[in-house]
């Protein structure tokens, strides 16, 4: 962002916050954050699970609004987006940990490593529920 008076930069923003993107990225990221009641900071990985009830409720509401403009091709990749986003964020947290925690703010030295583990565990939980998740998506 540029200050109108000084012409100097005042802040950096992610472009995905100001421009349209792939529907799958928004859909997958919404489910990634909504369907992990344990949150990103959980240290007990046994508590990290993909909550199918929350996913079903979100998907029903989402499809009421978005179902009319989603193509068959869009629908075919919805499960993949749910699986991809925690994996991708896990990679980003892990990369940041290896780089010295330069992108994601941390208050503890291994916080991004733990965040990566949480996301990878969430991805595993999604994979374990693939058949059920696909069934829900198919019915919508």
Locate predicted features.
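Active-site activation/catalytic loop segments of kinase-like enzymes and analogous catalytic loops
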Residues: 24-68, 84-103
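Transmembrane helix-bundle signature of multi-pass membrane transporters/permeases
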Residues: 19, 81-85
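ATP/Mg2+ or Mg2+-diphosphate-binding catalytic cores
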Residues: 88-140
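All-alpha amphipathic helical-bundle segments outside canonical DNA-binding/catalytic cores
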Residues: 70-82
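Active-site acidic catalytic loop and adjacent metal/ATP-binding pocket
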Residues: 1-25
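Short, conserved loop/turn and helix-capping segments at secondary-structure boundaries
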Residues: 17, 21, 52, 110-113, ...
């Amino acid at each position: 962002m540029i200050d109108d008076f000084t012409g100097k930069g005042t802040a950096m923003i992610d472009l995905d916050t100001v421009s349209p993107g792939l529907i799958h990225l928004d859909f997958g990221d919404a489910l990634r954050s909504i369907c992990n009641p344990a949150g990103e900071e959980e240290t007990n990985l046994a508590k990290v699970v993909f909550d199918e009830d929350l996913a079903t409720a979100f998907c029903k509401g989402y499809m009421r609004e978005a179902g009319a403009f989603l193509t068959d091709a869009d629908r075919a990749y919805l499960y993949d987006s749910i699986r991809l986003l925690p994996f991708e964020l896990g990679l980003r947290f892990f990369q940041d940990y290896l780089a010295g925690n330069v992108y994601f703010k941390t208050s503890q030295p291994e916080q991004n490593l733990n965040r990566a583990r949480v996301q990878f565990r969430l991805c595993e939980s999604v994979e374990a529920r693939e058949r059920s998740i696909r069934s829900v998506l198919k019915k919508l």
